[in-house]
Amino acid sequence: MPKSCAARQCCNRYSNRRKQLTFHRFPFSRPELLKEWVLNIGRGDFEPKQHTVICSEHFRPECFSAFGNRKNLKHNAVPTVFAFQGPPQLVRENTDPTGRSGDATSGERKVLPETGSGECGLGRKMDTTVEVLQLPPEVGGLGAQVPPHTPETSGVPGQPASPPELKRRLPTQPSDHSYALLDLDTLKKKLFLTLKENEKLRRRLKAQRLVMRRMCSRLRARLAGRPGLQARPRLGQQS
């Protein structure tokens, strides 16, 4: 059975032609998150089943994880992008009272009911719930602002570390290995000495091979000129 999106007024179906479109199942293991999904879909008396899915067009880009080749939803992702207006919808606003975006984990959630002025497809007025994420109040009052994050300072407080100071902190290159030498003349001298030593060893090896060949040929000649030396051990073994 082909997959189709469960959102209201959405006709997206699973097709190989649209590979960028993905379908995601409802979070049955998390009841609170499941309620948010069902409210945002905007279908009256809707009960999702185990294989009910919703397409990726109803999620914002920040709801997806940036790791991996597939589109994976984050653990707190909620569908908020819909083409219809007026149904019961739970909208998450990641803005604090000062107008700046805040973190969902650090803020304090408050659910405020609002009566919607629009009508549903069946002609009924329904309430919309808006979830506002607020930051905890500061000691100075509600109007206090959070100071911006300052970079790590160097030895003098109040001054950022300058690029020359950062360069001084970098470790120097060790020079205890032969390949770390920076003097080219020394390397050339070592190379020439090694080549000369290698040539001497080759000559000595060649001379030793010639000596071994001569000794082998002499031994063969002696054994060939005295056949009785090979027969004597055999006679001694028979006696």
Swiss-Prot record:
Keyword field: DNA-binding, Metal-binding, Zinc, Zinc-finger
Please give the InterPro entries that the UniProt record associates with this protein: THAP3, THAP_Znf
- The domain of life for this entry's organism is Eukaryota
Disordered as annotated region, ranges: 88-125, 139-174
Which PANTHER family does the annotation name? Answer: THAP DOMAIN-CONTAINING PROTEIN 3
Function of the molecule: Component of a THAP1/THAP3-HCFC1-OGT complex that is required for the regulation of the transcriptional activity of RRM1.
Protein name listed in UniProt: THAP domain-containing protein 3
Q: Please spell out the taxonomic lineage of the organism that makes this protein.
A: Eukaryota, Metazoa, Chordata, Craniata, Vertebrata
